[in-house]
């Protein structure tokens, strides 16, 4: 029983690559054919690659390590947040701030500011402050929540894998993962460089359904791995 079926991939449109003029020749092994100026991805390879990525993510989770989900393009934002929350992992879906992993102590300071602002809102401090100041503080809180809300509980030393939608868009995140020796799993479309990624999942990174399907599978792998970890205890 494979992790994902050809039918699921087809229905979600995972096989649609980019236009033929926008391609990376390194993706040639994953291309099945070309139709109407668009590359069609070889889904038999995608099935195998999803399985490899799934097994790897499951192992990472079973070892008690964390996975960080990264996807800041519009088509990925919702799936990245929903699936990371579902499997109780960390996510970045608005903007990758430089140093999120490599300079985590600075980022941790910003997270503390966010937590302090949340505390002020909850304990009624906002109610006694001048209105102008409250507006300013709320804007700051919203901005921090957007960028850091998904990594509030992150321990940067315990990240065992990074899952990425569109390595071209998330090159900063990937380069930080590389510096720290964190393996990268990614949905890689026909216009991306697969060499940047440790576990390549060839597929459409522009269709919401395609992104959701594969991201959900990675979240399933985390959940399965964590159950294994609990059983081992």
Curated annotation (Swiss-Prot):
Gene Ontology CC entries for this record: cytosolic small ribosomal subunit
A molecular function GO annotation: structural constituent of ribosome
Domain of life: Bacteria
SUPFAM superfamilies on file: Ribosomal protein S2 (SSF52313)
Coiled coil: none
Stored Pfam families: Ribosomal_S2 (PF00318)
Gene Ontology biological-process entries: translation
Listed InterPro entries: Ribosomal_uS2, Ribosomal_uS2_bac/mit/plastid, Ribosomal_uS2_CS, Ribosomal_uS2_flav_dom_sf
Cited Gene3D superfamilies: Glucose-6-phosphate isomerase like protein, domain 1, Helix hairpin bin
Keywords from the named record: Ribonucleoprotein, Ribosomal protein
Similarity-based family: Belongs to the universal ribosomal protein uS2 family.
Protein name: Small ribosomal subunit protein uS2
Organism: Clostridium tetani (strain Massachusetts / E88)
């Amino acid at each position: 029983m494979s992790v994902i079926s050809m039918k699921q991939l087809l229905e979600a449109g995972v096989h649609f690559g980019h236009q033929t003029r926008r391609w990376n020749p390194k993706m040639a092994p994953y291309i099945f054919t070309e139709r109407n100026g668009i590359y069609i991805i070889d889904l038999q390879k995608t099935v195998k690659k999803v399985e490899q990525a799934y097994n790897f993510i499951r192992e990472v989770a079973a070892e008690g390590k964390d996975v960080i989900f990264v996807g800041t393009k519009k088509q990925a934002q919702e799936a990245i947040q929903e699936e990371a929350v579902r499997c109780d992992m960390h996510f970045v879906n608005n903007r990758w701030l430089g140093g999120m992993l490599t300079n985590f102590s600075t980022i941790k300071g910003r997270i503390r500011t966010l937590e302090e602002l949340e505390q002020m809102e909850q304990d009624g401090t906002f109610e006694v402050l001048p209105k102008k100041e409250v507006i300013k503080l709320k804007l700051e809180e919203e901005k921090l929540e957007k960028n850091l809300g998904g990594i509030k509980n992150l321990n940067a030393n315990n990240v065992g894998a990074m899952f990425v939608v569109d390595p071209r868009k998330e090159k900063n995140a990937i380069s930080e993962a590389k510096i720290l020796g964190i393996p990268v799993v990614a949905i890689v479309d026909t216009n991306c460089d697969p060499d940047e990624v440790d576990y390549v999942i060839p597929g459409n990174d522009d269709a919401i359904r395609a992104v959701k399907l594969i991201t959900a599978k990675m979240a399933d792998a985390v959940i399965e791995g964590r159950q294994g970890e609990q059983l081992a205890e």
